[in-house]
Regions:
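A short, N-terminal "cap"/entry segment at the start of jelly-roll beta-barrel domains
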Residues: 1-17, 77, 81-123, 200
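Surface-exposed interaction/gating patches
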Residues: 6-8, 106-156
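Short acidic-glycine-tyrosine-enriched beta hairpin
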Residues: 50-70, 155-179
Length: 200
């Protein structure tokens, strides 16, 4: 579609049934109205995403469940990280959160970590975490994990992940199902989703 560019991060299945992509909308671009039979979930990384449900600035988190319908676009332009086809078939829960308007809370089990919960059920846990500069972070990864760096940076197994980096940790990533990261000099703000890869 003219005015919409994509960079695919991950795909399961030959026909894009389950895909994770970074999408850039040029100013004034719009899709035609359509239904998401298997749902969509996204984070607004830049600009303002617009659809039938509202205008969502950078920092917003949205879940449009299976059977939902909308006409997405962006008058000023935007960039989103979007996940398609990764819902339970009977999920009908909408989520629209502007994380700029809600506070984070300290994680009582991990020093140097603050959390903004976004969504949680028996299958997955989605949140934004804020990591203090230089903090050593442990993350439970049973069920798999995905991380997208919104700001700052962190190190994982010698690799530096900076803003707009994406990391996917599969099932049985490490013994004990724990990953360890080192936050960078400016700390890190990371979108995290865990527990959702058990059905792959």
């Amino acid at each position: 579609m003219a005015g919409v560019d994509r960079r695919r991060l991950d795909r399961v299945g030959a026909n894009d049934e389950r895909v994770t992509t970074v999408v850039r909308y040029a100013p004034g671009s719009h899709f035609s109205p359509h239904t998401h039979d298997t749902g969509e979930e996204f984070v607004v990384l830049d600009g303002v995403f617009q659809d039938d449900y509202g205008h969502w600035p950078a920092g917003s988190y949205v879940r449009n469940p299976p059977t939902s319908r909308h006409q997405p676009g962006s008058e000023p332009g935007c960039v989103i990280m979007v996940k398609l086809g990764q819902f339970q078939a009977d999920d009908r829960t909408f989520v629209h959160i502007d994380t700029n308007k809600i506070d984070s809370v300290p994680d009582s089990n991990r020093v140097g970590v603050w959390v903004t919960p976004l969504y949680k059920d028996q299958y997955e846990n989605v949140r934004v975490e804020y990591w203090d500069a230089g903090a050593t972070i442990e993350l439970i990864t049973d069920g798999g994990a995905e991380l997208f760096v919104l700001n700052g940076s962190f190190n994982e197994s010698g690799d530096e992940l900076v803003k707009n980096s994406w990391l996917r940790l599969p099932l049985n990533y490490k013994a004990g199902d724990k990953a360890s990261f080192q936050a960078g000099a400016d700390g890190a703000k990371v979108w995290i989703k865990t527990g959702h890869l058990t059905d792959l």
